[in-house]
Amino acid sequence: MRTHYCSAVNELSLDKQITVCGWVHNRRDHGGVIFLDIRDRSGLLQVVYEPENKEIFAIAEKLRSEFVVRVTGIVRKRPEGMINDKMETGRVEVIGIQLEILNQSPTPPFLPDDHQIINEDLRYKYRYIDLRRAVMQKKLTLRHKLNSCIRNYLNEQNFLDIETPMLTKATPEGARDYLVPSRVHPGQFYALPQSPQLFKQLLMMSGFDKYYQIVRCFRDEDLRADRQPEFTQLDIEMAFINEEDILQLIEGLLKVVFKEILNITLPDKLPRMSYKEAMTRYGSDKPDLRNPLELIDIADLVKDCDFNVFASAANDNSGRVVALKLPNGCDLSRKDLDNYGQFVTIYGAKGLAYIKVNDLSAGMAGLQSPILKFLSETAVQSILNRVEAQTGDVIFFGADKAHVVNESMGALRNKLGHDRNLINPGWQLLWVIDWPMFELDPQSNKLQPMHHPFTSPQELSAEALRSKPTQTLAKAYDIVINGYEIGGGSIRIHQPELQKTVFDLIGIDEQEAHEKFGFLLDALQYGAPPHGGIALGIDRLAMLLTDSTSIRDVIAFPKTQTASCPLTSAPSPAGNAQLTELGIRLAPTITTK
């Protein structure tokens, strides 16, 4: 039906007859001549229809935006003064000799023009029009290139692409499962997988020592800008390896991806930082290293001060007191400071103390703060020295339980970095390693795994794990790019007794363990090799590589913030006949059509 994509028509095609198919992007009448911009996924091509061919010209006069056409013509150079170097085909045009309308279109709710600002709900309702925009075509094309690059790299590394089940058993992995009722087993349900975690471990025990899969996963949890109920991840597992093997594999993969897609050369070895250091310096386990601001501990300087907010946190074993210096921040107004104070309360902080350094050489007289009356001159001077304050700086303080300080001041650090244009351009990739094996749930005061219950501790003794579980580190690692957690993984437990110990520590007794994970515990007894892996979020990685603000921009048909699809009206009620066949009766407050 066609001989060329639009963008393939160039000066090498001069004087040749070509045929293209696409949409009418624009139609202009100039002096009795009709100019068409024809669009396909490769780009735009200008076609000219002159009035001498009356039959074809009459068809061209009927064309409107988004009509689908087939155009045949002769390629020629554009006249001087009409060359458009902003277009890939801007030095040529096609003199139309044939024209066929393949389909018509009413006036669309919006035109696929990148210059228009379109309401997001409208974009998703008419996603098939939205996806015609050049920016969306480029983003999804880049995503395709990303997936192809990944497959090529892993295939060359002798990995096998193996599919795992979509209908599986519900397991507690930290989020709610999507359940699928079974018609042939009334009253029983499958779960859509949150990840192929257990199946890929079973593949290692089956002798497939290098597995990967670009796989859809499902989590029924609250949405954010970087979350979707269904998402795509690159899933990798390897046997007979250690942490270093995984890190080197991913460093090699990312180096190839960045070079092929962005023409950026990454270092052979990425920087590494312990979880403890990341939380101490940045208040986050996924720090954006492009931001120069850091948290500085000052608890030792304020233990004996008269400001109870500082002193109580400084003397609390689970407390923390930090300073965050904003260079040249004295221009912040009282309203600005109040807004930042309100901002940190979102993360559990009770307020935000600050000191403005108007004139460092003037001593206490050169400082401005409501808390100065509670602090001795010695304590203030020690704080100024610790943060290396300069005239014009403002110093913010966080004092509370450590987890509150980390979350609130880490978020403030990020906000200040963006508000004050402190984020350096470029790319900062980082491994966060040496994660705690467990954390204490603040509500139940029970241990819960930081990653998942199949992660191996660095200390492989079950006795040592039981004696100091909160001090035990895991063989776990996350890859962070520009402040986004792009992937995480670990070395897995391959000894059944150690796996049972971990289950016991997190409150899963032997009976529950066998009910939920009996197949895994059985498999571990039959010669399970040492193994480990990682999963990378394809959506997030594509979002960063395309400089998008949301993963919804790199997913063809995403869900909204309310986990709904305006295009298809999903989710929707099920009919009574279907519910009856599945053996389901809805609660009285829920109605069906």
Curated annotation (Swiss-Prot):
Annotated compartments: Cytoplasm
**A cellular component annotation (GO) from this entry:** cytoplasm
Assembly description: Homodimer.
Q: Is Mitochondrion one of the keywords UniProt gives this record?
A: no
Where L-aspartate binds, per the record, is at: 173, 219, 451, 492
What role does this protein play? Aspartyl-tRNA synthetase with relaxed tRNA specificity since it is able to aspartylate not only its cognate tRNA(Asp) but also tRNA(Asn). Reaction proceeds in two steps: L-aspartate is first activated by ATP to form Asp-AMP and then transferred to the acceptor end of tRNA(Asp/Asn).
Could you tell me the keywords of this UniProt record? Aminoacyl-tRNA synthetase, ATP-binding, Cytoplasm, Ligase, Nucleotide-binding, Protein biosynthesis
Gene Ontology molecular functions? aspartate-tRNA ligase activity; aspartate-tRNA(Asn) ligase activity; ATP binding; nucleic acid binding
The UniProt annotation places ATP binding at: 219-221, 228, 485, 537-540
Database matches in InterPro entries = Aa-tRNA-synt_II (IPR004364), aa-tRNA-synth_II (IPR006195), aa-tRNA-synth_II/BPL/LPL (IPR045864), Asp-tRNA-ligase_1 (IPR004524), Asp-tRNA-ligase_1_N (IPR047089), Asp/Asn-tRNA-synth_IIb (IPR002312), AspRS_core (IPR047090), GAD-like_sf (IPR004115)
In the Enzyme Commission scheme, what number(s) does this protein have? 6.1.1.23
Region Aspartate, as annotated, extends over 197-200
- Catalytic activity as recorded in UniProt: tRNA(Asx) + L-aspartate + ATP = L-aspartyl-tRNA(Asx) + AMP + diphosphate
Organism for this UniProt entry: Legionella pneumophila (strain Paris)
Q: Does the keyword Ribosomal protein apply?
A: no
Task: Please give the family membership noted in the entry.
Answer: Belongs to the class-II aminoacyl-tRNA synthetase family. Type 1 subfamily.
* PANTHER family listed in its UniProt record: ASPARTATE--TRNA LIGASE, MITOCHONDRIAL, ASPARTYL/LYSYL-TRNA SYNTHETASE
Please report the name of this protein according to its UniProt entry. Answer: Aspartate--tRNA(Asp/Asn) ligase
Q: Which domain of life is it from?
A: Bacteria
